[in-house]
């Protein structure tokens, strides 16, 4: 599993630990990833994703997984999230 958010594309960053004496050593800043099951209202089922805590807040803010994926750019999404986005779009087109 890569350390990358499936919805926002957030990944590890590099930087320095800086001591009181201003000694610098390399370190990695890892994203706060969580395995979650988000409910899709259109599909009527849960979708398992590995997303960052910030992405989870963004999903809640936008009104759920369906609304988040509708506005999300395809370049930022993982292959699994892109597949779910297309399934949702297909289901919404069939309903209308």
Curated annotation (Swiss-Prot):
> Entry's InterPro entries?
Ribosomal_bL28 (IPR026569), Ribosomal_bL28/bL31-like_sf (IPR034704), Ribosomal_bL28_bact-type (IPR001383), Ribosomal_bL28_sf (IPR037147)
Q: What is this protein called?
A: Large ribosomal subunit protein bL28
Keyword terms of this UniProt record: Ribonucleoprotein, Ribosomal protein
| Biological classification of the source | Bacteria, Pseudomonadati, Pseudomonadota, Alphaproteobacteria, Rhodobacterales
NCBIfam families (UniProt xref): L28
Member of which family?
Belongs to the bacterial ribosomal protein bL28 family.
Query: Which terms under GO biological process does the entry name?
Result: translation
Domain of life where this protein originates: Bacteria
Q: Does the keyword Nucleotidyltransferase apply?
A: no
- Gene designation: rpmB
GO MF term set: structural constituent of ribosome
């Amino acid at each position: 599993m890569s350390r990358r958010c499936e919805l926002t594309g957030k990944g590890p960053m590099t930087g320095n630990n800086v001591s009181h004496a201003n000694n610098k050593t390399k370190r990695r800043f890892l994203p706060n990833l969580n395995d979650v099951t988000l409910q899709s209202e259109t599909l009527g089922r849960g979708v398992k994703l590995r997303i960052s805590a910030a992405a989870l807040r963004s999903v809640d803010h936008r009104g759920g997984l369906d609304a988040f994926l509708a506005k999300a750019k395809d370049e930022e999404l993982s292959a699994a999230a892109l597949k779910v986005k297309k399934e949702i779009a297909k289901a919404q087109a069939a309903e209308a």
